[in-house]
Amino acid sequence: MEFNHVSVLLNETVDSVVTNPDGIYVDCTLGGAGHAHAVGERLSSQGMIIGLDQDEDALSVARQRLSDLKCQVLTIPTNFSNLKEALRNAGIYEVDGFIFDLGVSSYQLDTPERGFSYMNDGPLDMRMDKEAPLTAEEVVNEYDAEALLQIIRDYGEERWAKRIVEFIVNARQEKRITTTGELVRIIKNAIPAKARQDGPHPAKRTFQAIRIEVNRELAILHDSFVDAVSMLKPKGKIGVITFHSLEDRITKQTFKELSTACICPPELPMCVCNHKAVVKAKNKAIEPSAGEIEVNPRARSAKLRVAVKL
Protein backbone atom coordinates (compact mmCIF):
# COMPACT_ATOMS: atom_id res chain seq x y z
CA MET A 1 0.00 0.00 0.00
CA GLU A 2 1.37 3.41 -0.98
CA PHE A 3 1.30 5.86 1.93
CA ASN A 4 3.13 9.01 0.91
CA HIS A 5 3.03 11.61 3.64
CA VAL A 6 5.53 14.37 4.39
CA SER A 7 5.66 15.02 8.13
CA VAL A 8 5.42 18.71 8.99
CA LEU A 9 7.86 20.41 11.40
CA LEU A 10 9.59 17.05 11.81
CA ASN A 11 12.95 18.08 13.26
CA GLU A 12 11.44 20.91 15.30
CA THR A 13 8.95 18.53 16.90
CA VAL A 14 11.45 15.79 17.71
CA ASP A 15 14.02 18.30 19.02
CA SER A 16 11.37 19.90 21.24
CA VAL A 17 9.83 16.74 22.69
CA VAL A 18 12.52 14.03 22.88
CA THR A 19 14.92 14.46 25.82
CA ASN A 20 15.52 10.94 27.15
CA PRO A 21 16.91 8.20 24.86
CA ASP A 22 15.63 5.56 27.30
CA GLY A 23 12.19 7.15 27.58
CA ILE A 24 8.66 6.26 26.50
CA TYR A 25 7.17 8.48 23.79
CA VAL A 26 3.67 8.41 22.35
CA ASP A 27 2.70 9.56 18.87
CA CYS A 28 -1.04 10.07 19.31
CA THR A 29 -1.66 10.50 15.57
CA LEU A 30 0.61 7.83 14.11
CA GLY A 31 -0.42 8.13 10.44
CA GLY A 32 2.46 7.14 8.18
CA ALA A 33 4.81 7.11 11.22
CA GLY A 34 6.98 9.99 10.04
CA HIS A 35 7.23 11.62 13.46
CA ALA A 36 7.25 8.27 15.27
CA HIS A 37 10.14 6.95 13.18
CA ALA A 38 12.16 10.12 13.74
CA VAL A 39 11.53 9.83 17.49
CA GLY A 40 12.48 6.14 17.44
CA GLU A 41 15.81 6.95 15.79
CA ARG A 42 16.69 9.03 18.86
CA LEU A 43 15.90 6.20 21.29
CA SER A 44 18.04 3.38 22.67
CA SER A 45 17.01 -0.26 22.87
CA GLN A 46 15.57 0.60 26.30
CA GLY A 47 13.36 3.33 24.87
CA MET A 48 9.88 2.87 23.45
CA ILE A 49 7.75 4.56 20.80
CA ILE A 50 4.00 3.98 21.02
CA GLY A 51 1.72 4.91 18.13
CA LEU A 52 -2.03 5.46 18.32
CA ASP A 53 -4.25 5.63 15.25
CA GLN A 54 -7.85 4.74 14.46
CA ASP A 55 -7.09 4.22 10.76
CA GLU A 56 -6.20 0.57 10.09
CA ASP A 57 -4.63 1.47 6.73
CA ALA A 58 -2.24 3.83 8.52
CA LEU A 59 -1.43 1.29 11.24
CA SER A 60 -0.55 -1.37 8.69
CA VAL A 61 1.94 0.90 6.94
CA ALA A 62 3.29 2.33 10.19
CA ARG A 63 4.10 -1.08 11.66
CA GLN A 64 6.17 -1.92 8.61
CA ARG A 65 7.94 1.43 8.64
CA LEU A 66 8.82 1.20 12.33
CA SER A 67 10.15 -2.37 12.07
CA ASP A 68 13.75 -1.26 11.48
CA LEU A 69 14.07 0.65 14.77
CA LYS A 70 16.20 -0.69 17.62
CA CYS A 71 13.87 0.71 20.27
CA GLN A 72 10.71 -1.03 21.45
CA VAL A 73 7.63 -0.36 19.30
CA LEU A 74 3.95 -0.67 20.17
CA THR A 75 1.01 0.32 17.96
CA ILE A 76 -2.53 0.60 19.33
CA PRO A 77 -5.66 0.87 17.14
CA THR A 78 -7.56 3.65 18.90
CA ASN A 79 -8.43 7.32 18.76
CA PHE A 80 -6.31 9.54 20.97
CA SER A 81 -9.42 10.46 22.97
CA ASN A 82 -8.90 7.02 24.57
CA LEU A 83 -5.18 7.48 25.16
CA LYS A 84 -5.21 7.16 28.96
CA GLU A 85 -7.21 3.93 28.97
CA ALA A 86 -5.27 2.50 26.02
CA LEU A 87 -1.89 3.18 27.62
CA ARG A 88 -2.93 1.84 31.01
CA ASN A 89 -4.23 -1.32 29.37
CA ALA A 90 -0.75 -1.69 27.85
CA GLY A 91 0.85 -1.29 31.29
CA ILE A 92 2.05 2.27 30.66
CA TYR A 93 1.42 4.77 33.47
CA GLU A 94 4.09 7.42 32.89
CA VAL A 95 5.32 8.89 29.62
CA ASP A 96 8.30 11.08 28.68
CA GLY A 97 6.62 12.83 25.77
CA PHE A 98 3.50 13.08 23.62
CA ILE A 99 3.14 14.24 20.01
CA PHE A 100 -0.15 15.23 18.38
CA ASP A 101 -0.13 16.02 14.64
CA LEU A 102 -3.69 17.21 13.99
CA GLY A 103 -3.47 17.38 10.21
CA VAL A 104 -5.14 14.96 7.83
CA SER A 105 -2.48 12.77 6.23
CA SER A 106 -1.56 13.28 2.61
CA TYR A 107 -2.56 9.65 2.03
CA GLN A 108 -6.09 10.33 3.26
CA LEU A 109 -6.35 13.54 1.26
CA ASP A 110 -5.02 11.95 -1.91
CA THR A 111 -7.08 8.76 -1.76
CA PRO A 112 -10.39 9.64 -3.45
CA GLU A 113 -12.32 6.72 -1.97
CA ARG A 114 -11.72 8.07 1.55
CA GLY A 115 -13.82 11.10 0.64
CA PHE A 116 -11.59 13.82 2.12
CA SER A 117 -10.47 15.39 -1.15
CA TYR A 118 -12.09 18.31 -2.92
CA MET A 119 -9.61 17.82 -5.78
CA ASN A 120 -10.68 14.28 -6.72
CA ASP A 121 -14.15 12.80 -6.99
CA GLY A 122 -15.08 10.12 -4.50
CA PRO A 123 -17.78 9.04 -2.05
CA LEU A 124 -18.77 11.55 0.63
CA ASP A 125 -17.17 9.72 3.55
CA MET A 126 -14.42 11.60 5.46
CA ARG A 127 -14.22 9.06 8.31
CA MET A 128 -10.74 8.64 9.76
CA ASP A 129 -12.08 5.51 11.46
CA LYS A 130 -13.73 3.54 8.67
CA GLU A 131 -15.92 1.75 11.23
CA ALA A 132 -17.35 4.99 12.67
CA PRO A 133 -21.10 5.42 12.14
CA LEU A 134 -21.30 9.03 10.91
CA THR A 135 -20.27 9.91 7.34
CA ALA A 136 -20.01 13.19 5.47
CA GLU A 137 -22.89 12.06 3.27
CA GLU A 138 -25.16 11.89 6.31
CA VAL A 139 -24.05 15.32 7.54
CA VAL A 140 -24.63 16.94 4.15
CA ASN A 141 -27.99 15.29 3.47
CA GLU A 142 -29.57 14.79 6.89
CA TYR A 143 -28.51 17.71 9.10
CA ASP A 144 -31.03 20.54 9.11
CA ALA A 145 -30.06 23.89 7.62
CA GLU A 146 -29.40 25.52 10.99
CA ALA A 147 -27.00 22.76 12.10
CA LEU A 148 -25.19 22.82 8.75
CA LEU A 149 -24.83 26.58 8.94
CA GLN A 150 -23.32 26.42 12.42
CA ILE A 151 -20.84 23.74 11.37
CA ILE A 152 -19.66 25.46 8.18
CA ARG A 153 -19.55 28.89 9.80
CA ASP A 154 -17.85 27.87 13.05
CA TYR A 155 -15.63 24.94 12.02
CA GLY A 156 -14.83 26.22 8.54
CA GLU A 157 -14.82 29.95 9.31
CA GLU A 158 -16.46 30.29 5.90
CA ARG A 159 -17.82 33.76 5.11
CA TRP A 160 -20.21 32.33 2.49
CA ALA A 161 -21.61 29.68 4.87
CA LYS A 162 -25.23 30.84 4.69
CA ARG A 163 -25.26 30.87 0.89
CA ILE A 164 -23.49 27.49 0.68
CA VAL A 165 -26.07 25.92 3.01
CA GLU A 166 -28.92 27.35 0.93
CA PHE A 167 -27.45 25.77 -2.20
CA ILE A 168 -26.86 22.43 -0.42
CA VAL A 169 -30.43 22.30 0.88
CA ASN A 170 -31.86 23.13 -2.55
CA ALA A 171 -29.68 20.50 -4.25
CA ARG A 172 -30.48 17.70 -1.81
CA GLN A 173 -34.22 18.29 -2.22
CA GLU A 174 -33.82 17.25 -5.84
CA LYS A 175 -31.30 14.42 -5.33
CA ARG A 176 -29.22 13.01 -2.50
CA ILE A 177 -25.65 14.35 -2.59
CA THR A 178 -23.34 11.32 -2.54
CA THR A 179 -19.95 12.35 -3.97
CA THR A 180 -17.28 14.92 -3.22
CA GLY A 181 -17.47 16.11 -6.81
CA GLU A 182 -21.16 16.94 -6.48
CA LEU A 183 -20.54 18.86 -3.26
CA VAL A 184 -17.66 20.81 -4.80
CA ARG A 185 -19.86 21.88 -7.72
CA ILE A 186 -22.59 23.03 -5.33
CA ILE A 187 -20.10 25.05 -3.27
CA LYS A 188 -18.58 26.64 -6.38
CA ASN A 189 -22.03 27.64 -7.59
CA ALA A 190 -22.83 29.15 -4.19
CA ILE A 191 -19.73 31.34 -3.95
CA PRO A 192 -19.72 34.37 -6.28
CA ALA A 193 -17.20 34.10 -9.11
CA LYS A 194 -15.24 37.15 -7.94
CA ALA A 195 -14.77 35.64 -4.47
CA ARG A 196 -13.42 32.43 -6.04
CA GLN A 197 -10.62 34.15 -7.94
CA ASP A 198 -8.19 34.51 -5.04
CA GLY A 199 -7.25 32.46 -2.02
CA PRO A 200 -7.57 28.72 -1.38
CA HIS A 201 -9.85 26.29 -3.19
CA PRO A 202 -13.46 27.44 -2.70
CA ALA A 203 -14.46 24.11 -1.14
CA LYS A 204 -11.55 23.94 1.33
CA ARG A 205 -13.27 25.52 4.33
CA THR A 206 -16.54 23.64 3.90
CA PHE A 207 -14.75 20.30 3.54
CA GLN A 208 -12.69 21.12 6.64
CA ALA A 209 -15.84 21.89 8.60
CA ILE A 210 -17.63 18.69 7.60
CA ARG A 211 -14.52 16.59 8.31
CA ILE A 212 -14.26 18.10 11.79
CA GLU A 213 -17.92 17.29 12.47
CA VAL A 214 -17.67 13.71 11.17
CA ASN A 215 -14.61 12.92 13.30
CA ARG A 216 -15.47 15.08 16.35
CA GLU A 217 -12.01 16.57 15.98
CA LEU A 218 -12.41 19.66 18.14
CA ALA A 219 -14.64 18.09 20.78
CA ILE A 220 -11.93 15.67 21.91
CA LEU A 221 -8.89 17.96 21.88
CA HIS A 222 -9.07 19.66 25.30
CA ASP A 223 -9.72 16.49 27.29
CA SER A 224 -7.10 14.53 25.33
CA PHE A 225 -4.43 17.16 26.05
CA VAL A 226 -5.36 17.14 29.75
CA ASP A 227 -5.16 13.33 29.82
CA ALA A 228 -1.77 13.37 28.11
CA VAL A 229 -0.35 15.94 30.54
CA SER A 230 -1.63 13.90 33.50
CA MET A 231 0.52 10.98 32.30
CA LEU A 232 3.68 12.98 31.67
CA LYS A 233 6.66 12.52 33.94
CA PRO A 234 8.11 15.70 35.49
CA LYS A 235 10.00 17.56 32.72
CA GLY A 236 8.19 15.45 30.12
CA LYS A 237 6.92 17.36 27.08
CA ILE A 238 3.82 17.55 24.93
CA GLY A 239 4.01 18.89 21.37
CA VAL A 240 0.89 19.72 19.34
CA ILE A 241 0.94 20.55 15.62
CA THR A 242 -2.17 22.39 14.43
CA PHE A 243 -3.28 23.40 10.95
CA HIS A 244 -6.07 25.92 11.48
CA SER A 245 -7.00 28.62 13.97
CA LEU A 246 -9.68 26.59 15.77
CA GLU A 247 -7.25 23.80 16.69
CA ASP A 248 -4.56 26.30 17.60
CA ARG A 249 -6.94 28.29 19.80
CA ILE A 250 -7.99 25.19 21.75
CA THR A 251 -4.35 24.11 22.14
CA LYS A 252 -3.27 27.55 23.30
CA GLN A 253 -6.19 27.90 25.73
CA THR A 254 -5.66 24.42 27.18
CA PHE A 255 -1.94 25.04 27.70
CA LYS A 256 -2.78 28.39 29.33
CA GLU A 257 -5.30 26.72 31.64
CA LEU A 258 -2.78 24.03 32.61
CA SER A 259 0.00 26.59 33.20
CA THR A 260 -2.09 28.94 35.36
CA ALA A 261 -1.97 28.58 39.15
CA CYS A 262 -5.32 30.25 39.86
CA ILE A 263 -8.39 30.24 37.61
CA CYS A 264 -10.77 32.03 39.98
CA PRO A 265 -12.87 34.93 38.65
CA PRO A 266 -10.84 38.15 39.01
CA GLU A 267 -13.49 39.78 41.22
CA LEU A 268 -12.89 37.28 44.05
CA PRO A 269 -10.70 38.73 46.85
CA MET A 270 -8.78 35.47 47.34
CA CYS A 271 -8.12 32.18 45.58
CA VAL A 272 -10.65 29.45 46.33
CA CYS A 273 -10.12 27.16 43.31
CA ASN A 274 -6.96 25.40 44.58
CA HIS A 275 -5.97 24.99 40.94
CA LYS A 276 -2.26 24.32 40.43
CA ALA A 277 -0.14 24.96 37.37
CA VAL A 278 1.06 21.63 35.99
CA VAL A 279 2.94 22.72 32.87
CA LYS A 280 5.05 25.56 31.59
CA ALA A 281 4.04 26.45 28.04
CA LYS A 282 6.27 28.15 25.50
CA ASN A 283 4.68 31.49 24.64
CA LYS A 284 5.34 31.45 20.91
CA ALA A 285 4.35 28.77 18.44
CA ILE A 286 7.02 27.30 16.15
CA GLU A 287 6.21 27.70 12.45
CA PRO A 288 7.67 26.05 9.32
CA SER A 289 10.60 27.65 7.54
CA ALA A 290 10.19 29.14 4.09
CA GLY A 291 12.21 26.21 2.76
CA GLU A 292 9.85 23.63 4.24
CA ILE A 293 6.80 25.45 2.87
CA GLU A 294 8.38 25.52 -0.59
CA VAL A 295 8.95 21.74 -0.49
CA ASN A 296 5.61 20.98 1.19
CA PRO A 297 2.98 23.71 0.64
CA ARG A 298 0.58 21.89 3.01
CA ALA A 299 2.88 22.98 5.85
CA ARG A 300 2.02 26.64 5.31
CA SER A 301 -0.59 26.89 8.07
CA ALA A 302 1.11 24.56 10.57
CA LYS A 303 2.01 25.64 14.10
CA LEU A 304 3.80 23.67 16.81
CA ARG A 305 3.06 24.43 20.47
CA VAL A 306 5.06 22.80 23.25
CA ALA A 307 4.53 22.54 27.01
CA VAL A 308 6.73 21.02 29.73
CA LYS A 309 5.40 19.16 32.79
CA LEU A 310 6.42 20.83 36.04
Task: Give the predicted meaning of each segment.
Residues 1-310:
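S-adenosyl-L-methionine-dependent methyltransferase catalytic core, i.e., the SAM/SAH-binding region
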